[in-house]
């Protein structure tokens, strides 16, 4: 996979990308990342990339020229292609696991990271997706883009040590992940559930599914609306929602 990132703060992106899973993917030659400082493409004599909005208003907007020219550079380095272009924007669709799975199918992704008050609307003619990390405000798009990149790259083939890790993660099944334990069996009186020590994998799977449903119902009931639930799952949920008499 090839990923391009357009940003005003390349160091915010370059350093984290060479750590952990994403860094291993780069080292293994399964991922190639280029980071472009679009300020370098400003034709303004002062190198400005922002200006006041027409009609008034607080803050400054990113001007189209530097980003358009930076995208031309990306095209020149990638056989005249920018791949699938993602604008990191608080007004976009909220990022989720399904979107990460969709991105992981692409050969080339380009992320545009904003700053200041927002973008000149004409910049959006360059993009395929406008994506937000959530309903909160951060200073720029770099941290959000890094999160999306990490969530996407870990889904690529042969990136994780255990191929089942990505499948078992929270949200991959539409539910939150079940509780997990490791050694020791008893830590300061806090014991591992006996079912996990039984060796009965059928019962363990049942316990994990029930715990996953229980956690999702308590913390993210909205996920149950789109999760693929079996008749057994629905019965478990009915029992969980029935108060003890």
UniProtKB/Swiss-Prot annotation:
Location in the cell: Cytoplasm
Positions of S-adenosyl-L-methionine binding: 114, 133-138
InterPro entries: Alpha/beta_knot_MTases, tRNA_m1G_MeTrfase_C_sf, tRNA_m1G_MeTrfase_TrmD, tRNA_m1G_MTases_N, tRNA_MeTrfase_TRMD/TRM10
Catalytic reactions on record: guanosine(37) in tRNA + S-adenosyl-L-methionine = N(1)-methylguanosine(37) in tRNA + S-adenosyl-L-homocysteine + H(+)
Keyword Methyltransferase recorded: yes
Keyword vocabulary terms for this entry: Cytoplasm, Methyltransferase, S-adenosyl-L-methionine, Transferase, tRNA processing
Record-level GO cellular component terms: cytosol
GO terms for biological process, alphabetical: tRNA N1-guanine methylation
UniProt record similarity statement: Belongs to the RNA methyltransferase TrmD family.
Name of the protein in question: tRNA (guanine-N(1)-)-methyltransferase
Native species: Pediococcus pentosaceus (strain ATCC 25745 / CCUG 21536 / LMG 10740 / 183-1w)
């Amino acid at each position: 996979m090839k990923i391009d990132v357009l940003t005003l703060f390349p160091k915010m992106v370059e350093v984290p990308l060479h750590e952990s899973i994403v860094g291993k993917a780069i080292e293994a030659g399964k991922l190639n990342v280029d980071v472009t400082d679009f300020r370098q493409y400003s034709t303004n004599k002062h190198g400005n990339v922002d200006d006041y909005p027409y009609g008034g208003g607080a803050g400054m907007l990113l001007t189209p020229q530097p980003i358009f020219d930076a995208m031309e550079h990306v095209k020149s380095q990638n056989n005249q292609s920018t791949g699938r272009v993602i604008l990191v924007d608080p007004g976009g669709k909220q990022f989720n696991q399904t979107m990460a799975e969709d991105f992981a199918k692409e050969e080339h992704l380009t992320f545009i990271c904003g700053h200041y008050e927002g973008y000149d609307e004409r910049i959006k003619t360059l993009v395929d997706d406008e994506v937000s990390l959530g309903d909160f405000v951060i200073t720029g798009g770099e941290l959000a883009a890094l999160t999306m990149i990490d969530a996407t790259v870990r889904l690529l083939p042969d990136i994780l040590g255990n191929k089942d890790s990505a499948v078992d993660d929270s949200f991959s099944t539409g539910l939150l992940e079940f509780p997990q334990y490791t050694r020791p069996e008893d830590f300061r009186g806090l014991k591992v559930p006996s079912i996990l020590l039984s060796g009965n994998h059928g019962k363990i799977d049942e316990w994990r599914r029930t715990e996953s449903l229980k956690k999702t119902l308590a913390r993210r009931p909205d996920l149950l609306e789109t999760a693929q639930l079996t008749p057994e799952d629905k019965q478990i949920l009915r029992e969980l929602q029935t108060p003890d008499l």
